[in-house]
């Protein structure tokens, strides 16, 4: 397996698809990286030469990916929670952040139903 940005990318897939296994790189960004590095996107990772892998490593360094990106996103959420804005409070309470309704729906964000005992007759 080729190792780029600390991630083992699959050998049997096309380079274009394999790059998407790196957190922060989708298909569009993978195509841009391949164009910048001058690597054929249709070639399989196992057929890449060492020089091509080095070019890809250099091209991916221009982007914020993997651990740095995860840390950046986490710090952005923490900042919202620390300043106490509405978005931060909604994140803290595990509720939808962008104004969706919560009286019904929002099950994914709120989790499974918690049954409240009814009044006995």
Curated annotation (Swiss-Prot):
Q: Which GO terms describe its molecular function?
A: rRNA binding; structural constituent of ribosome; tRNA binding
Cellular component terms, GO, for this chain's entry?
Answer: cytosol; small ribosomal subunit
Annotated Basic residues bias: 100-121
Q: Which family does it belong to?
A: Belongs to the universal ribosomal protein uS13 family.
Tell me which species this is from.
Answer: Synechococcus sp. (strain CC9902)
Q: What highest taxon heads this organism's lineage?
A: Bacteria
Q: Which keywords does this chain's UniProt record carry?
A: Ribonucleoprotein, Ribosomal protein, RNA-binding, rRNA-binding, tRNA-binding
In terms of InterPro entries, this protein maps to: Rbsml_uS13_C, Ribosomal_uS13, Ribosomal_uS13-like_H2TH, Ribosomal_uS13_bac-type, Ribosomal_uS13_CS
**Disulfide-linked positions:** none
Q: How does it assemble?
A: Part of the 30S ribosomal subunit. Forms a loose heterodimer with protein S19. Forms two bridges to the 50S subunit in the 70S ribosome.
**Name by which UniProt lists this protein:** Small ribosomal subunit protein uS13
GO BP, one example?
translation
Tell me which PROSITE patterns the record gives: RIBOSOMAL_S13_1, RIBOSOMAL_S13_2
Task: State the protein's purpose.
Answer: Located at the top of the head of the 30S subunit, it contacts several helices of the 16S rRNA. In the 70S ribosome it contacts the 23S rRNA (bridge B1a) and protein L5 of the 50S subunit (bridge B1b), connecting the 2 subunits; these bridges are implicated in subunit movement. Contacts the tRNAs in the A and P-sites.
Region of interest called Disordered, as start-end residue ranges on this chain? 97-121
């Amino acid at each position: 397996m080729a190792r780029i940005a600390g991630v083992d990318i699959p050998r049997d897939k096309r380079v274009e698809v394999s790059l998407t296994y790196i957190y922060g790189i989708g298909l569009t960004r993978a195509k841009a990286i391949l164009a910048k590095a001058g690597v054929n996107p249709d070639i399989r990772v196992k057929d890449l030469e060492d020089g091509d892998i080095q070019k890809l490593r250099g091209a991916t360094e221009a982007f914020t990916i993997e651990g740095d990106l995860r840390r950046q996103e986490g710090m952005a959420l923490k900042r919202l929670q620390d300043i106490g804005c509405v978005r931060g409070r909604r994140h803290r309470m595990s509720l939808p952040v962008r104004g969706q309704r919560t009286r019904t729906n929002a099950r994914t964000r709120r989790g499974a139903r918690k049954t409240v005992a009814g009044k006995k007759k």
